[in-house]
């Protein structure tokens, strides 16, 4: 098992065991299933108190992308480039946010314990889709795709999930 596999396994195990919410394990399973199918490129932007990312849809990768935002205080959202909230939220973090957390761990932009705390802080907060912030995330992403700014994606490979 590689160091990356070990970090991801530690994060996923700790997330399942420390967040007392029955909706989280099935969402983790969906995220891992998605990552096991094929390579994925995730654009991750993490600061001391905010995680923002862009993730392509698994079912419609050429048509649909999601912007996510998770703050250390527990505020979060996920929505499409058409500025519609993610249908998988249902009041809790969705698989897209979990995917972004895993990519953050893999890229060493956040620690396991830090990301667990951030997720734990979401327990009493409902998602609130923030269109201006989502738009800003998508504009930054498009600027990176167009080569206007440098924002390198994190590549997640199916091999990263051999331990699952």
Predicted regions and their residues:
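Long, low-complexity, compositionally biased intrinsically disordered regions
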Residues: 1-164
């Amino acid at each position: 098992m590689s160091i990356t596999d070990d970090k991801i396994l530690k994060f996923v195990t700790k997330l399942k065991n420390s967040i007392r919410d029955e909706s989280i394990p099935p969402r983790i399973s969906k995220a891992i299933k998605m990552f096991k199918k094929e390579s994925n490129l995730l654009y991750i932007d993490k600061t001391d108190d905010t995680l923002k990312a862009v993730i392509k849809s698994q079912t419609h990768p050429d048509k649909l992308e999601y912007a996510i935002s998770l703050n250390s205080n527990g505020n979060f959202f996920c929505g499409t480039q058409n500025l519609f909230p993610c249908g998988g939220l249902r009041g809790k973090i969705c698989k897209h946010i979990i995917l972004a957390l895993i990519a953050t761990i893999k890229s060493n932009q956040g620690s396991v314990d830090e990301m667990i705390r951030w997720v734990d802080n979401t327990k009493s907060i409902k998602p609130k889709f923030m269109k201006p912030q989502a738009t800003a995330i998508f504009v930054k992403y498009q600027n990176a795709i167009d080569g206007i700014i440098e924002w390198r994606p994190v590549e997640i490979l199916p091999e990263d999930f051999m331990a699952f």
